């Protein structure tokens, strides 16, 4: 019987046998409270196939609503949830709990090189300023083409 069918029949859904308690250690920063950042640890229940983003949601929704982080598509497309997880730049929505050694605290901090606004949120404007300055696209000198511009091996 599926979990949905069991729930509809009045039975409790089956409990996962792989759930574990993981410690998420987050570098917190709130300029309205202090100029210094500090580490805070939270314990959440997680499955090995949960994503770090799921753990952050549990912290925010169940333990500390003041935690601030960006997320959007949750499918690894937009890059909104880029952060340092266990010392590496990663997307929280693509990083599985089982891949970051959940037997030890999972450290989460903002990405480096950009000013931190609050907790895991950084000011992206310096990045976008640099992006606009290099114009990472082709600019034509004439009229728009009427068909696709094909590139030969010699043109590359």
Task: Please name every model-derived segment.
Residues 2-156:
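Signature of N-terminal electron-transfer/Fe-S-associated modules in redox systems
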